[in-house]
Structures are given as C-alpha cells and as structure tokens.
C-alpha cells in the first residue's frame, strides 16, 4: 500500500474523522477530550497547510457558491448552516474567516472546516480572518481551549496552518471577498497575489487591512478605526475600487450585523456574519449568502434563539 505522505491523508481515516465530528454535536458537561485525538488534529493542520500553499493567495472561484461569515467557535450554528445550505459537496462553500475564539467549540469548528478542505479541495474554501493569528487567538480563547483540551504544542501547529491561509477570493471576476475590507495600499486586486506565505499578520499594511478594516458611512475616504488597528473607509472608496477593478460587489465579514447581513454604499458592499446570538450577548441573526450562476445574491438566515426570560 502507498505510504501516506505529509501532504495527503488516508481517505477512510478522513471520512471517519468527519463522521465523528458530525456525531459530536453537543458535548456532555465535563467532557475533556474532543472526539479526535491530538495526532489526528495535527494531521488535519499539516495536510490543510499544504493545500493552502498549493492554491493561490487570491482564490479565483466560480458561482454557484455559498458564502459564510464569522463562526467564532459556535459549532452547532456551523452545523445548522450546513443543514440549510447542504453538507459538502452538495454545495460549494467559501468561508470568510474567524473560525476560532469566543465560542465554546473552536476546536470542533476548525477541525470540521479543515477536514472538508482536505476532502473537497476544489469545492470548499477558507479565507483568513483576523482571529487566525497567534497574537489574537492567544488572548480571545483558542489558545486556552487548545491548552485545556490538548496542549500548547497543538496550538502552535494550528498557527502554522493559519499562517498559510489565503486572504481573498474573486468570484467570476466580479465579486471580491475578504474578511475585513479595503486598504489604502490596494489599488489593483493583483497586488494580493504578491503577499508571501507563510506569514504572520503585521500591525499595518495591505494584509493587515484586508483582515481588519471596516466600512463607515460617516467617513469620506479613509478614517481612524475604533479597533485601534487599520482604517475605516467610506462609500466613495468602495465605488472607486469597484470601478477601477471592473467589479460589482465587495463581500466581507468582521462585524456583527443584526440581520446576519447588511448592505453598504448602495449595495456595492455586503457584510455577512454567520454566528447568531453572537457570544450569547447579542440578539443578532446569522446569514449565509448564496450566489447563483448569474451572480444573483440571496440570503439564508439563521434566526437567533428565543431568549428565555431571566425572571418570570
């Protein structure tokens, strides 16, 4: 039998990992270990990293495709998205980053996504979010979850994979997708191809902005960002970029929006956020955007759970 190299995975073993992940919907209280062992998770990281590097940093994709925003470890909501849209490979998917941190099940979330990436490399796509970065997920929960359930060593293996994620995608030359937004350093989409990987996310510059910037209706041109990182950009910058690059729409995530999706700049930009009841603190819906062959966009909504009254 052929030896499985670092860049491949036994198909039966991969299918078994996916089966266990789909079985493991709600862990019992006090369950320490996930349904996977550390060496299996490490293998998911190593093999997916190879695939990310084999594919371009600016993905060129075709419709029809379904696009999802932030998940943030809300594993049961990720499974709801697949129930709505169809489990891979019945539909093609693009995720816009922020798979880990804040939610309770970052490990299940990222493991299922990496497993699907390995199984369906030409039908399932993952972009990098600002939380797929060691300095951020060290603080906001993923490091602690890895350490508590497995080891710090495993967190470092995830970091190696995250440092190779692509940062943007273009759908049929007309829809530009990224996690955060535009950059004053970005005039031509082709520039994204020049970002070298593996790389950490720097504190400023093109890669930082693609993962961190936000649209703002109150700004003309470029403005300060309340996050303390990157910029905000006005509707004028969206229109200018689309005209210059002969595109129709910018699709991004990165911000909680009440209905799960929200248009900006005369529907030239859309924000998609896919974690309903974000952190248990918001009453937002989650959404998934379906792009059909003619590039018509429609939305599937995950309604927030009904809040239980605290006092009767």
UniProtKB/Swiss-Prot annotation:
Subcellular location: Nucleus; Cytoplasm
Family of this protein: Belongs to the PPP phosphatase family. PP-1 subfamily.
Reactions mediated catalytically: O-phospho-L-seryl-[protein] + H2O = L-seryl-[protein] + phosphate; O-phospho-L-threonyl-[protein] + H2O = L-threonyl-[protein] + phosphate
Cofactor note: Binds 2 manganese ions per subunit.
Subunit comment: Interacts with SRK2D/SNRK2.2 and SRK2E/SNRK2.6.
PROSITE patterns given in the database record: SER_THR_PHOSPHATASE (PS00125)
UniProt-listed Pfam families: Metallophos, STPPase_N
Ranges in a coiled coil: none
Keyword Iron-sulfur among UniProt keywords: no
GO cellular component, one term: protein phosphatase type 1 complex
Superkingdom per UniProt: Eukaryota
GO process annotations (BP): protein dephosphorylation
Residue numbers carrying N-acetylalanine: 2
Keywords, alphabetical: Acetylation, Cytoplasm, Hydrolase, Manganese, Metal-binding, Nucleus, Protein phosphatase
Gene, per the UniProt record: TOPP2
GO molecular function: metal ion binding; protein serine/threonine phosphatase activity
InterPro entries, per the entry: Calcineurin-like_PHP_ApaH, Metallo-depent_PP-like, PP1_catalytic_subunit, Ser/Thr-sp_prot-phosphatase, STPPase_N
The keyword Metal-binding belongs to this UniProt entry's keyword annotation: yes
Species assigned in the record: Arabidopsis thaliana
Protein name: Serine/threonine-protein phosphatase PP1 isozyme 2
Positions bound to Mn(2+) 2: 98, 130, 179, 254
Active site: residue positions: 131 (proton donor)
Residue positions binding Mn(2+) 1: 70, 72, 98
EC main group: hydrolase
SS bond partners: none
E.C. no: 3.1.3.16
